[in-house]
Amino acid sequence: MSCESSMVLGYWDIRGLAHAIRLLLEFTDTSYEEKRYTCGEAPDYDRSQWLDVKFKLDLDFPNLPYLMDGKNKITQSNAILRYIARKHNMCGETEEEKIRVDIIENQVMDFRTQLIRLCYSSDHEKLKPQYLEELPGQLKQFSVFLGKFSWFAGEKLTFVDFLTYDILDQNRIFEPKCLDEFPNLKAFMCRFEALEKIAAYIQSDQFFKMPINNKMAQWGNKPVC
């Protein structure tokens, strides 16, 4: 860990949009501390822990997650990931790598949005079959894009691998057999989890696999799956 002053990552006490950020901070051996906010129980789901300070943190666009690094105060999860990644040359080097990074960064967010909408929908059980029906087609696109590369930008690890690992893992928890038809995606997951810093983090007390979503969600809202 760096001896410099720690970054502060603020987010709900869930996995959510902060998981890839936490993974990247751990992988890069960045000194950081977390400010975790707790959402209240049903039926009100009181968010006052966050709302009471939301406009007092000098954030340009107050939201969660946020990252504070000295005078730099950043919101938007992908902006946070890029900020950390730039410090470690993990945004792609060649033009081809940068294009692949940009594509997969946005594709992952589209994919994530679909799962989030399903998980928070009051019609979750009604909509779930359609999601599962379309899931193999979605995953096939990721599989074809990855091809024979080790990582999604090519042969060099970039921040989008952290994003992609997270959303593939969420879908794997949602439907445990969903990656079985895609050996290269399964190999990617194993390769990522075998990275020394990632493997150590997964085994640590700081890591939590669940809950993925907040308490008002219909799925992924419990400490265990």
UniProtKB/Swiss-Prot annotation:
Binding of glutathione: at which residues? Answer: Y11, W12, W50, L51, D52, V53, K54, N63, L64, Q76, S77
Q: Which CDD domains match?
A: GST_C_Mu, GST_N_Mu
According to its UniProt entry, the protein's GO biological process terms are: glutathione metabolic process
Q: Which GO terms describe its molecular function?
A: glutathione transferase activity
Q: Which reaction does it catalyse?
A: RX + glutathione = an S-substituted glutathione + a halide anion + H(+)
Cross-link Glycyl lysine isopeptide (Lys-Gly) (interchain with G-Cter in SUMO2): residue positions: K54, K73
Q: Which GO terms describe its cellular component?
A: cytoplasm; intercellular bridge
The GST N-terminal domain covers which part of the protein?
5-92
Location in or out of the cell = Cytoplasm
Q: List UniProt keywords, sorted A-Z.
A: Cytoplasm, Isopeptide bond, Transferase, Ubl conjugation
Domain of life the protein comes from: Eukaryota
User: What does the record give as EC number?
Assistant: 2.5.1.18
How does this chain assemble?
Answer: Homodimer.
Q: What does the UniProt function comment say about this protein? A: Conjugation of reduced glutathione to a wide number of exogenous and endogenous hydrophobic electrophiles. May govern uptake and detoxification of both endogenous compounds and xenobiotics at the testis and brain blood barriers.
Q: Which protein, by its recorded name, is this?
A: Glutathione S-transferase Mu 3
Q: What is the lineage of its organism?
A: Eukaryota, Metazoa, Chordata, Craniata, Vertebrata
